[in-house]
From Swiss-Prot:
GO terms for biological process: photosynthesis. Pfam families: PsbY. GO terms for molecular function: manganese ion binding. This is Photosystem II reaction center protein Y. It comes from the Bacteria. Belongs to the PsbY family. It is found in: Cellular thylakoid membrane. One of its GO terms (cellular component) is plasma membrane-derived thylakoid membrane.
């Protein structure tokens, strides 16, 4: 039972890390774009 869980974890962990890293970068870029839009609309 543990062997299956360990293999599943080894497969899922890097995928989760990649997805969360991509989501973090996309979110940060989106926040930057929103801040630019807000600054432009005020100016």
């Amino acid at each position: 039972m543990l062997g299956i869980d360990a293999r599943l974890f080894l497969v899922v962990a890097p995928i989760l890390a990649a997805v969360s890293w991509a989501a973090f970068n996309i979110g940060r870029a989106a926040v930057g774009q929103l801040q630019l839009l807000i600054k432009r609309s005020r100016a």
